[in-house]
UniProtKB/Swiss-Prot annotation:
It holds the Pfam family Methyltransf_5. GO terms for molecular function: rRNA (cytosine-N4-)-methyltransferase activity. The gene is rsmH. GO terms for biological process: rRNA base methylation. This is Ribosomal RNA small subunit methyltransferase H. The lineage of its organism: Bacteria, Bacillati, Actinomycetota, Actinomycetes, Micromonosporales. It comes from Salinispora arenicola (strain CNS-205). S-adenosyl-L-methionine binds at G44, G45, H46, D63, L97, D111, Q118.
Amino acid sequence: MGVDMGELRGAHVPVLLERCLELLAPALGRAGRTVYVDATLGLGGHAEAVLATHPQTMLVGLDRDTEALAHARVRLARFADRVHLEHAVYDELPDVLDRLGHPVVDGILFDLGVSSLQLDAPDRGFAYAQDAPLDMRMDQTRGLTAEEVVNTYPHPDLARVLRVYGEEKFAPRIASAIVRERERDPITSSARLAELVRQTIPAPARRTGGHPAKRTFQALRIEVNRELAALETALPAALDRLTIEGRLVVLSYHSLEDRLTKVALADRVRSKGPVDLPVELPGTGPTFRLLSRGAELPGEAEVAMNPRAASVRLRAAERLDPTAEQRRRTDRERYRRRVRAMHQPGTGSAVRRPTPGDDGTGTDEEGEGHDS
């Protein structure tokens, strides 16, 4: 079922909305009440579309940003009897679900990274294109600010943050420039930091790869909000909470997020049993199957409609019925072994020739017809 974007309220355009709805539909469209978790609610665009599409679905929405929660609450007011919003980070998901009495859920969405609200807010410090205090906290009620990181981290720690979280090859040079500059005067604004980074990076590198400060700002944001540490905890916990045939969809916006997602899913889709056994041992088979071939990328139309979708990578998976999957894998393995045995030297041809007096119409003990 498609969603008319004109019917969705507000100017915010959810990323890959139709694809997310398509992937979640089999899990959320089942008979009876279903539970959908939006682990990164933001402005509520994906949640609004899910609730409009699935009248029996209950929403549990999490966000660490109190301002985003306030906007989403207004946006989702017409679904109020099916909505429960929580001020929480996604690695707190198990605690939230336990408190609400949901041991398992049917669908979960992670739309990672910084939200449109945070990018567009002139006073939050996320954007290098406008001057603002160096805050960068998604939850402005707690935690270190980017200003504190920039002005207090020793050089080795600052360089590590820029190298690991920003994948910035000039990390040591930028860290040195920051340390020198802050000794003269604390760095308190996004514009000053962005200009310092621009001046520090060699001129040829400035002309490629977008804004020179992009990777530095990404690294600081990830450090301030503990994004990767939280995601590393949250993804396995979310997978554990899905019911059989429940589905997880993850939208990531840089390689570090996508890498963590890929690893978390890969761990669940492979067999953990001995490779040389003819049958799958109980408890060793895959517990999920992938719904996407690698990371799905946005199409040209999506990017034209929503430029912020340009860097998105989508991965999705579905929880398997362990009994049914074990039976299918055992049947497939038995079939493969029989085929291999038929072609082993000394076992004869895979095609059985009729013997004298055999009209070729009988069946063997396995119930398979003879070939004439």
